[in-house]
Regions:
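C-terminal outer-membrane beta-barrel translocator/porin domains of Gram-negative envelope proteins
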Residues: 42, 75, 188-198, 202-314, ...
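Single conserved hydrophobic/aromatic residue that forms the stacking wall/gate
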Residues: 1-3, 316-319, 323-329
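Short loop/turn motifs that connect adjacent beta-strands in outer-membrane beta-barrel proteins
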Residues: 98-104, 127-133, 148, 166-172, ...
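Solvent-exposed loop/turn segments connecting transmembrane beta-strands
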Residues: 58, 81-88, 107-118, 144-153, ...
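Feature captures outer-membrane beta-barrel proteins of Gram-negative bacteria and organelles
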Residues: 89-98, 116-129, 134-136, 156-166, ...
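Transmembrane beta-strand segments that form the barrel wall of outer-membrane beta-barrel proteins
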Residues: 20, 73-83, 90-113, 134-144, ...
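Transmembrane beta-barrel wall of Gram-negative outer-membrane proteins
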Residues: 118-199, 205-207
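Periplasmic polypeptide-binding modules associated with outer-membrane biogenesis and secretion
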Residues: 4-86, 92, 106-124, 245-246, ...
Length: 329
């Protein structure tokens, strides 16, 4: 099989070919072609992706022609609002195809009357043309709640990792993260917060195992995907063990209606004393919509402090043609 691509004036050819499960000289496979086109669409850097099979110069030779239509991949967003934490501001710069090499860059800054958060992440889905994902980032968060809850903490986190397909449909994702946590309290803080005051450093090794049996990565209609994640302390002033399990099962009821059952569970266990406030589990906002970020779970006074255990079951129904989604938790 011969492969030709066109329409990519900004995007490098290597970005397109890195997502293909078919290589030059391979026999034609309709299943691999369908999955390849799905992977290209999932990159979210093309407005349209079209494929065409034409006969070659010989009877047993096929030519795969892939035509793409590029779209703006950069996004700048700014917002302001008034809520339970008072006035808040946010600013985000995101690029999904940096330098036309498929690099993803995300910079965020958000501020409210009691918190300030900033972060920069970057990932390369095809590092050194190996097909392996490599990512890294840094985030810093400052919560100044001396007036309302008697504490102030600053958390800085650095992470780096990779993800690759070890076997067909089996992905392995090892990584490291380094965090610094400084918690200061005054006399009005709760006893639980006073016990956790101080400066703490933690260096962890994290890994994930994922089994992906979906028919395609972009808007799957059948199959399932399951993953297990664990965080192991290499060095920690107050160590803890983190575990997470996720599972999603998809089923297409018709061409227009796709259903999914999703399960999410996570635990964190202290290996010395109590789990630190900054390490407790909170429900990711993308898992349960309709709630403010970090505003679900146990509370200490007026503060949401997270917990040591979390479970979530979700029934999700989507209509891709209408771009409509319904979720039941």
């Amino acid at each position: 099989m011969c492969i030709r691509d066109s329409g990519n004036t900004v995007t490098s050819d290597s970005v397109i070919r890195s997502e293909l499960l078919l290589d030059e000289g391979d026999p034609y496979s309709k299943l691999k072609l369908s999955k390849s086109i799905s992977e290209l669409k999932a990159r979210n850097i093309f407005k349209k992706v079209q494929e065409k099979i034409v006969d070659g110069s010989k009877n047993d030779l096929k030519i795969l022609e892939i035509t793409v239509e590029e779209k703006p991949t950069g996004e700048i967003a700014a917002g302001a609002g008034v809520g339970t934490e008072g006035t808040s501001f946010s600013f985000t710069v995101q690029e999904n195809n940096y330098l036309g090499k498929g690099l993803m860059v995300d910079a965020t800054l958000s501020a409210s009357e009691e918190s300030l958060r900033g972060g920069l992440t970057m990932s390369n889905p095809n590092f050194n043309y190996t097909g392996n994902l490599v990512y890294g980032g840094i985030t810093s968060t400052n919560n100044d709640k001396l007036k309302s809850s008697g504490y102030e903490n600053t958390i800085t986190n650095l992470n780096i990792g990779t993800k690759f397909e070890q076997y067909e449909g089996i992905f392995f994702s090892p990584g490291f993260d380094l965090s610094f946590d400084d918690l200061r309290v005054d006399g009005t803080a709760s006893d639980k917060l006073k016990k956790q005051a101080g400066e703490f450093t933690e260096f962890n090794f994290n890994y994930s195992l994922q089994m992906d049996k979906r028919d395609r990565a972009f808007m799957p209609t059948s199959g399932s995907v399951a993953s297990f994640t664990q965080g192991l302390p290499i060095y920690a002033d107050q160590p803890s063990l983190y575990n997470r399990l996720t599972y999603s099962k998809y089923h297409g009821f018709s061409d227009d209606v796709i259903g999914a059952v999703k399960f999410y569970a996570a635990t964190i266990t202290a290996l010395d004393e109590d789990v630190r406030l900054s390490k407790r589990i909170t429900l990711p906002s993308k898992r349960l919509r309709g709630f403010e970020r970090g505003k679900v779970g146990p509370k200490d006074g007026e503060d949401y402090i997270g917990g040591n255990f979390l479970t979530l079951s979700l029934i999700h129904i989507s209509e891709p043609t209408r771009q409509a989604e319904i979720s039941y938790a």
